[in-house]
Structure formats: structure tokens, C-alpha cells
A protein has these predicted regions:
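Active-site flanking loop/helix segments enriched in acidic
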Residues: 13-14, 34, 38-42
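Membrane-embedded alpha-helical segments that form the functional core of polytopic membrane enzymes
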Residues: 41-97, 114, 133
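Short amphipathic alpha-helical coupling elements at transmembrane boundaries
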Residues: 28, 32-36, 85, 89-92, ...
């Protein structure tokens, strides 16, 4: 694949050097196609949002076939979520508002997915506990989003604070065992979560994500309270 660079040569789309996240391998092949279209990064983010919300709606229907469709739509959503940043850098259209919009969409999709999955599982089994597990996971995602907003608001006026663009392009590498645990947790629960969802949907067992999400979402926002957990490019 021929390399693509930004007009000033400051950014070049390169092949992923690591196995994870898997969606990065998909976006690496999709971004050159989107680059040729008259789409802005924010429009790509909006497409990602539509795909993700449609996926959440599919899970709310509570059937196996709709679950597979929902999982596929989530893969599209997460892939486009990678593409928007790559398009922003290639077209030199990165902006603080675009980063904030991207964060907002991430929260919307996470919350909608768990709420939809919880409702769909409740509807198909008659057990309302599944619904409350979904709500707990969505609440955890909401708390994490609020923590991120507070973090960025506090660091905004600090001279040494990084911009959203610098945070996105400054790839942090794990240095010790604790770093690797946090790194893998963030990768699997964030960047490649859609692949896990699709895999489980193929066997009609996405319900297992509800208790895991109800607990894991709380663990995610708790780790985000600490500086050590921040900076992973997922």
C-alpha cells in the first residue's frame, strides 16, 4: 500500500507495528479510501456515531441475528473511530472541538451499547437483573467520561499540559508489569472491545458482558483517577 502523508509531511499513515488493537489494522486499510472522499474528520466521527448507535439498537432487540448485526456495526463504529483521527492528521484538520466531539461519541456508544444489551437481554429472558447490569455499566462509562472532562478542564491552563492531538499521537509504552496489566486492560476493554462483542454475538452469549461490564466499567473509571493509567493510545 502506497504511503499517504499530510500536506506538510508532518504525519504519514503507517502500517500498525503491533497486533493490538485489531481495529487499527482495519482503519489502516480504510483510511486511504476515506481520504479520497470530500469528508471532514468530524463527519467521519458522525458516521462512527451512527453506526455505533445502530449497533446498540440491534442489541436492544434481543435476538441472536440482530446481535450479530449489532456486533458488525460496532466493528464499523470502532474502525471509523480510528479513521477520524488519521483523516484529521492527514488533512491537517485536527481541532480541540473535534477531539471533544470524538470523546462525546465514545461515551455515547459505550453507554448506549450496555443499556441496549441490558434491555434486550431482559426482554428475551424476562430477568430484569440483566437490565440493571447494563445500566450499571452505562453509569460507569458516564462517570469515566465526567472524570475525563474534569481532567482536561484542570490541565487546560497548565503550561506543560499536552493538547488532545499530542496525547493522541504520543504513543506511551508499558515499562513494567503493572503498566502491562493496565495497558492490556485498556486495549481489550476499549480499542478491541468491538471484536470481543462480535465474537460473543456469533455464539449468542453477549449476555456475559453485562456482569463483566457492570464491574469492569467501575474498574475503568477508578484506574483513570490515577495518572499512571492515562496516556495509553487506545
Amino acid at each position: 500500500m502506497a504511503s499517504i502523508s499530510s500536506p506538510d509531511g508532518s504525519y504519514t499513515l503507517t502500517a500498525p507495528a503491533q497486533a493490538l488493537p485489531l481495529t487499527r489494522h482495519l482503519s489502516y486499510r480504510l483510511t486511504p479510501l476515506i481520504y479520497r472522499l470530500p469528508l471532514t474528520p468530524n463527519q467521519v466521527t458522525a458516521l462512527s456515531m451512527l453506526a455505533g448507535l445502530a449497533g446498540a439498537w440491534c442489541f436492544a432487540l434481543g435476538t441472536a441475528n440482530w446481535g450479530i448485526a449489532g456486533g458488525a456495526l460496532l466493528v464499523v463504529c470502532y474502525t471509523l473511530d480510528n479513521c477520524d483521527g488519521e483523516i484529521a492528521r492527514l488533512k491537517d484538520m485536527s481541532s480541540e472541538w473535534g477531539a471533544q466531539f470524538d470523546d462525546l461519541v465514545d461515551w455515547m456508544i459505550d453507554s448506549a451499547f450496555f443499556a441496549g444489551l441490558g434491555y434486550g437481554t431482559w426482554d428475551s429472558t424476562g430477568e430484569i437483573l440483566w437490565f440493571w447490569c447494563g445500566i450499571a455499566a452505562a453509569a460507569g462509562a458516564t462517570i469515566d467520561y465526567v472524570i475525563d472532562l474534569i481532567h482536561h478542564a484542570k490541565s487546560k491552563n497548565q503550561p506543560e499540559a499536552k493538547t488532545r492531538e499530542e496525547e493522541a499521537t504520543d504513543v506511551r509504552k508499558p515499562e513494567d508489569f503493572k503498566d502491562w496489566l493496565i495497558y492490556i486492560f485498556h486495549k481489550l476493554s476499549r480499542a478491541d472491545f468491538c471484536v470481543i462483542v462480535l465474537g460473543l454475538a456469533l455464539f449468542d452469549v453477549t449476555w456475559v458482558l453485562l456482569p463483566l461490564g457492570a464491574i469492569g466499567a467501575q474498574a475503568y473509571w477508578i484506574t483513570d483517577l490515577f495518572q499512571r493509567a492515562r496516556g495509553w493510545h487506545t
